[in-house]
């Protein structure tokens, strides 16, 4: 593989994460305007965004098999057609049914693209370099999550219709589409086996189970925590602005943490540093929940920084459980994380209704503790060290 080809594939991975981040995080900014557009209450409007999450979940799950049947380049180019159709559907839709279908299609495109982006990084880079690259790729999710809400705010403040926000997000996919030209993609499935020596099928091992549970609990814990921080802070007497600032501080610190750890991770054993970070994050969340209100900003800043590398490290360790990075394995761990996203309000909603926001934060803290335990147990069964040694000797 030429260096210029590797750079193009890496940028496709970066943009794939940016696309998903933009679609998921911009939801809160546009929901009110969309509800007014369809003359519906915001509460019922929020349910239609489940179609976006469902599309992401289904496509990540199915793409583990699709990757071996449909070439990656074909998938990305067909995704461009679907993206244009979905944005056009949003622009002309005056029925909630067409809006829901368009959201589902956006989710499908986003999930397929992100699973391809994740696989490309795990395929092109080995060992510790893989973890660092995947972490830097994941930072584009947060970066898009910071940029596109600002774009949405500017457009909506000028009374420009909400669907132009999605047209702007579509420009990210235009960049992916352009990069597919003159770019060679890895060949998977039967065609790959004909051109190379047959690869013996590897068993995943019990470590993948621990990592999958960790991925689900981490995302469910993180989103369950950050979704209810504003309500919890307001309950302590904070203003709406101060409560919102806690959330923005968390994501800002999270992004800086990703950049820092993309360099730091190269010098440590991935399972050991993951266990330390999961333990630190659990303690910091406990201190945030039980500490004095004047210290909350510091605790959430440090929590954002030290928890930023956890999810990507889980995915990277998953990919290192086999000698050759398996798209099915990577997608399985990703799917478990996405299930955590889907369950966020299913799990925390009833808890808040019954016991208040504090109980939701304590539940999230318990889930982080489960992540720590899973990472600790993983140390006894992980295969990444023997595969790293093999990779280093080649």
Swiss-Prot record:
GO cellular component: plasma membrane
GO molecular function ontology, one term from the record: transmembrane transporter activity
Location of this chain's protein in the cell: Cell inner membrane
Gene3D superfamilies: MFS general substrate transporter like domains
Alphabetized UniProt keyword annotations: Cell inner membrane, Cell membrane, Membrane, Transmembrane, Transmembrane helix
UniProt main location, coarse: membrane
Database matches in Pfam families: MFS_1
Family annotation (InterPro entries): MFS, MFS_dom, MFS_trans_sf, MFS_TsgA, MFS_TsgA-like
Membrane topology: Multi-pass membrane protein
TM segment ranges: 11-31, 51-71, 78-98, 101-121, 134-154, 162-182, 206-226, 250-270, 273-293, 297-317, 332-352, 361-381
Family listed: Belongs to the major facilitator superfamily. TsgA family.
Name the record gives this protein: Protein TsgA homolog
Biological source species: Enterobacter sp. (strain 638)
